[in-house]
């Protein structure tokens, strides 16, 4: 049910604005970025950020799934 609500919200946002208005607001960012003269600068800056994110250590909670398990008679939601 949540996924249906999210899908409806996305369709409503896309249908609410004409195409040029969506580009101006950034809802469809790819055509708008292609027209901006700074697009090559943005494209070159992205790979510098990506390796830092890839090298970040994973949180400890993700490595221990037993912490998430429900104890005893409790229901796991």
Curated annotation (Swiss-Prot):
The gene is APD2. GO terms for biological process: antibacterial innate immune response; antifungal innate immune response; killing by host of symbiont cells. It comes from the Eukaryota. Residues 1-16 form the signal peptide. Antimicrobial peptide that binds cell wall carbohydrates of microbial symbionts and induces structural damage. Binds the cell wall carbohydrates mannan, N-acetyl-D-glucosamine and lipopolysaccharide. Can target fungi, Gram-negative and Gram-positive bacteria. One of its GO terms (cellular component) is extracellular region. This is Apidermin 2. Induction: Expression is increased following microbial infection by A.apis and P.larvae. Expressed in the epidermis, hypopharyngeal glands, fat body, trachea, esophagus and stomach. It comes from Apis mellifera. It is found in: Secreted. Keywords: Antibiotic, Antimicrobial, Immunity, Innate immunity, Secreted, Signal. One of its GO terms (molecular function) is carbohydrate binding.
